[in-house]
Design a protein with these regions (language model features):
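P-loop NTPase switch/communication element
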Residues: 115, 142-180, 184-185
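Hydrophobic positions on the alpha1 helix immediately C-terminal to the Walker A/P-loop
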Residues: 133, 137
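P-loop NTPase motor-domain active sites and their immediate coupling elements
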Residues: 21, 33, 43, 64-98, ...
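Short hydrophobic/aromatic beta-strand immediately N-terminal to the Walker A/P-loop
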Residues: 120-121
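N-terminal anchoring/assembly modules that precede and organize ATP-driven motor systems
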Residues: 1-27, 33
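Conserved lysine of the Walker
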Residues: 130
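The conserved Walker
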Residues: 61, 126-127
């Protein structure tokens, strides 16, 4: 149907199809003499022909001489965490704290590295998958890192999402569910952060990786990750303290 819909703009061919979980991307190579603008301006017409809510056209793609046509799938595909874990992108990741983030529009696994961020805000509407994404990131790190490499401080005032991790050896402290205790724990972790900055300064290094290379094995520092579920709610209750 897509080929038929494109036929009236001139000759060309679809050279690649990349199915993703949400959309399928088609690379269309216009024949000589066909203007790219003719294809790019066809979004609404293609959506009507394909009976789709919308069609996104991106082009031209540098170095390929093609235009990408992104068509929403009739049903969104499920992306399983295991698929990302067994992928080459995750298995061969050089990141110290790899995050399995999902798949891109072409169905290729997307893996991030928390140490390269190092702050991360997950935002979205209710029911959009924020908690699922957060749990996937935590599991990604737990999958690869031992307690000697990474430790967590988990703050969960609503007691709904992070309590499942209670008792794992990676915790700096029991999962925090009280807002007052959360403020205390955050002040504590900030104090510890200042101590670490002084330790890095003493060794004349810029990060934990550099510090761990400069000291003996028994003196190495683990990464510390603070995870706060529903940060906005915590700030409303304890705005001054947080």
């Amino acid at each position: 149907r897509l080929a038929n819909a494109l036929a009236h703009v001139g000759e060309g061919r679809i050279v690649q199809v990349s199915p993703g979980p949400i959309i399928t991307s088609y690379e269309f190579e216009p024949a000589a003499g066909v203007k790219v603008s003719q294809v790019v301006n066809l979004g609404d017409d293609l959506a009507l022909a394909l009976k789709s809510a919308s069609v996104r056209i991106v082009g031209p793609i540098p170095g390929r001489g093609t235009v990408a046509i992104e068509v929403p799938n009739a049903e969104a595909g499920m992306v399983y965490l295991r698929e990302i874990f067994v992928s080459a992108e995750f298995a061969e990741s050089k990141g110290r704290l790899p995050l399995a983030l999902g798949k891109d529009v072409n169905g290729v696994p997307v893996v991030g590295d928390l140490t390269a961020m190092p702050h991360l805000l997950v935002a979205g509407a209710t029911g959009s998958g924020k908690s699922v994404g957060l749990n996937a990131m935590i599991c990604s790190i737990l999958y690869k890192a031992t307690p000697a490499v990474v430790r967590f401080l988990l703050i969960d005032p609503k007691r709904l999402e992070l309590s499942v991790y209670e008792g794992i050896p990676h915790l700096l402290a029991p999962v925090v569910t009280d807002t007052k205790e959360a403020s205390t724990r955050l002040r504590w972790i900030v104090g510890k952060m200042d101590e670490r900055y002084k330790a890095l300064q003493a060794k004349q290094v810029r990060n934990i990786e550099g510090y761990n290379k400069a000291v003996a094995a028994e003196e190495r520092l683990p990464y510390w990750i603070v995870v706060v579920d529903e940060l906005a709610d915590l700030m409303m209750v304890s705005a001054g303290a947080v």
